[in-house]
């Protein structure tokens, strides 16, 4: 069993039940999924860079990434229907816990001048969004094999009913939030 999954079962669940006085065990907040997405921008024109980006995200996530295509044409953005516009991967169950463990204990501490994640990333429904400026902080990524550095958006979806519950859940998982507020 994964380290964070054990932590959730043994100490996080009881702490959340105690703090929020939850009577029904089905209402205890838990992680649902983690979505990693990248907008490809100008890189969509170069198939080699696009494939390299998809391979990098697959390495980071430990699961095959999917290239997403535009659903309709938008002249203002010079995008036509069917053009690649992004790359995403959705992690659930064990892969989700493995990625979160790697993110919290390895990747985020490697970020230069890291002061913690912003507390403003909650959406009001118990989900948390944040962005990373580059992919080089992950141990699987080799600098020599990267054709173009890119950032990524990470969405952590929880079953929490409020941002307060979601914040406490993520804090107990060890997600480093910035001090203040």
Curated annotation (Swiss-Prot):
Family annotation (PROSITE patterns): RIBOSOMAL_L5
UniProt cross-references to InterPro entries, sorted A to Z: Ribosomal_uL5, Ribosomal_uL5_bac-type, Ribosomal_uL5_C, Ribosomal_uL5_CS, Ribosomal_uL5_dom_sf, Ribosomal_uL5_N
Single GO BP term: translation
PANTHER family named in the record: 60S RIBOSOMAL PROTEIN L11-RELATED
Subunit structure and binding partners: Part of the 50S ribosomal subunit; part of the 5S rRNA/L5/L18/L25 subcomplex. Contacts the 5S rRNA and the P site tRNA. Forms a bridge to the 30S subunit in the 70S ribosome.
Protein family according to the UniProt entry: Belongs to the universal ribosomal protein uL5 family.
Protein name per the record: Large ribosomal subunit protein uL5
Gene that encodes the chain: rplE
């Amino acid at each position: 069993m994964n380290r964070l999954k054990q932590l959730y079962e043994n100490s996080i669940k009881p702490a959340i039940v105690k703090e929020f006085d939850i009577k029904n065990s089905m209402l205890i907040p838990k992680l649902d999924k983690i979505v990693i997405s990248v907008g490809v921008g100008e890189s969509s024109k170069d198939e080699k860079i696009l494939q390299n980006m998809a391979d990098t995200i697959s390495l980071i996530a430990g699961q095959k990434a999917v290239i997403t295509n535009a659903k309709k044409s938008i002249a203002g953005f010079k995008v036509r229907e069917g053009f690649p516009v992004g790359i995403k991967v959705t992690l659930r169950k064990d892969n989700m816990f493995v990625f979160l463990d790697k993110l919290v204990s390895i990747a985020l501490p490697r970020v230069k001048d890291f002061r913690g994640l912003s507390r403003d990333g909650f959406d009001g429904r118990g989900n948390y969004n944040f962005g990373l400026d580059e992919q080089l902080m992950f141990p699987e990524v080799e600098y020599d094999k990267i054709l173009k550095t890119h950032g990524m958006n990470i969405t952590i979806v929880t079953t929490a009913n409020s941002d307060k519950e979601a914040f406490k859940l993520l804090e107990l998982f060890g997600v480093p939030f910035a001090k203040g507020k």
